[in-house]
């Protein structure tokens, strides 16, 4: 609904978020916090501490992560999450979509991310250009960033200041505070559909959970 059209500077979000030395300009420093990582839903569209199918107590243990382009050992916290998690967060043995070579092979433009101390994107002996959390931000970073050419500016696009989704979420929270749960769920539906999630009332019903006022307020926030 409202966007900031000013161009991003060289040391902006895209530079600071992309993996270290994948291309000519990448800072490797904007680390998603653990609190934010845990706020993303499970693959069933529920908070991970509410989903009976999600191993919440074992989330800090290790497991095998597999997808079409890369795999490896990672924390269980990074497995069986919702689509937005994988679109917005890079994690140990996950992937980052950046343009790093010529050619039509989509997999050639995907970097497997490894953040342990001596891994390719780990801290090693550096004092800067590393993620302090073991995660990197992908949200707001164009897959066309980090071309192999030198001195390529970050792809320019209008930065969303006020999103339509924010209005839906505000409306859902207002309905929830009034105890109008059905209307709150209806307001959330377009946001969840766009994110590839079932409607909130269906997700709770499938899990055998009760969707009350407090739960709906939490989902809207």
List PLM regions with ranges.
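Acidic/polar-rich alpha-helix caps and helix-coil junctions
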Residues: 1-28, 44-221
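Helix N-cap / beta->alpha transition motif
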Residues: 31-37, 91
